Amino acid sequence: LTEVVKAQSFTKAAENLYTSQPSISRDIKRLENDYDVKVFEFKHSKMTLTSDGEKLYQYVLQRNYLEQALRQDLKMQNNAVAGDLKLGSSFTFGEYRLSRQLTKLAQMYPELHIHVHLDNSETIVEQIKNNIVDVGIVEKKIQNNAIISTPIAQDEIVLIKKKSSSSNLETCFIREQGSGTRVYQENGLNQLSLNPYLVVINNTSLIKSMVHAGNGFSIVSKSTLTSEDLEQLEVINLDIERFFYLILHKDKYIDEKMKRVISVLKQNVE
């Protein structure tokens, strides 16, 4: 069931599990018969979980978490912090703030192998919900009953434009929908009563390059600005503050390894 939900396709799920599509279909049908529910429905050629299917899926996830917890407990000796851990982070935090924590974790726990995946905040939330990553860090507060979120760092949003250029506020480089930064960029434009032509770019470094070239302006996290940026760009404070949040699935089993990793992620994030 979990693989079908991830793949959004019986055929793709079968390929991922190295089995046949009819076998997957029989397994889902068996679930429906056992629990007397309809698991999936199709709307406009898109497969989605029914309300009963969503409940069943959450129970399956919880069971998987418990099985994973049991296996980890049985393998854990002397609270050793070892093995693999999957960390999902928003682009801004991952590219500009995460290196210090990763370095510290590598020094403290050389047997721990952390696999980092960077994406926008919405995607990281979905990966947490579907148990694709163990821990997530996002750029906005999450309103979801399946997610536990804890603020771990404060951030400041600023407007940037090239110092030497005329006040070009006609073109704004902005992040894609789903990015935590996008929400605050829109708030900043509203606050300044600006209605510029928007160019969507899903990479902050490229956005800054466009601003350095004098092609327009942007609204970004102050933590993304280097000393070179501060020297060449005009930085205007917008009095917009936000937090970065550490997120976990509410049913995630927090073993000793997770506790120690989370503790380090909450430290030295400025």
UniProtKB/Swiss-Prot annotation:
Keywords for this protein: DNA-binding, Transcription, Transcription regulation
Alphabetically, the GO molecular function entries are: DNA-binding transcription factor activity; transcription cis-regulatory region binding
HTH lysR-type domain: which residues? 1-50
Record flagged with keyword DNA-binding: yes
Keyword DNA-binding part of the UniProt annotation: yes
- Tell me which Pfam families the record gives: HTH_1, LysR_substrate
Where is the DNA-binding region?
A: 10-29
Q: Which family does it belong to?
A: Belongs to the LysR transcriptional regulatory family.
Q: Mind telling me which PANTHER family this protein's record contains?
A: HTH-TYPE TRANSCRIPTIONAL REGULATOR, HTH-TYPE TRANSCRIPTIONAL REGULATOR CYSL
Return the protein name: Uncharacterized HTH-type transcriptional regulator in lacR 5'region
